[in-house]
């Protein structure tokens, strides 16, 4: 499950795992995401609450009601079939995270992103 956080200016939050965590998309910019075996909304909500500290001036615990499911997509990498379950999360402002970027959703082409991230961005843009 992936969260497309979107502020009123059309900006979104992009993060990357420089140390190889999340090896499939290591070192590429991506939306905050987590593997969800059961309830993707709850799993993603818990993941966001874990990676975004309250000290970032943002309270992830209030997100559950604001998570709008987007069109699911499929992505294949080597021998893995991945089902992408994105959620659009409208926020008054994006959290401040060290090392993160906040580009406009409409202008992600200048970042190194995977085709899976591109599919998620396309689903979000289509829903707007």
State the predicted function of each range.
Residues 1-128:
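Intrinsically disordered, low-complexity, charged terminal extensions of DNA damage-control enzymes
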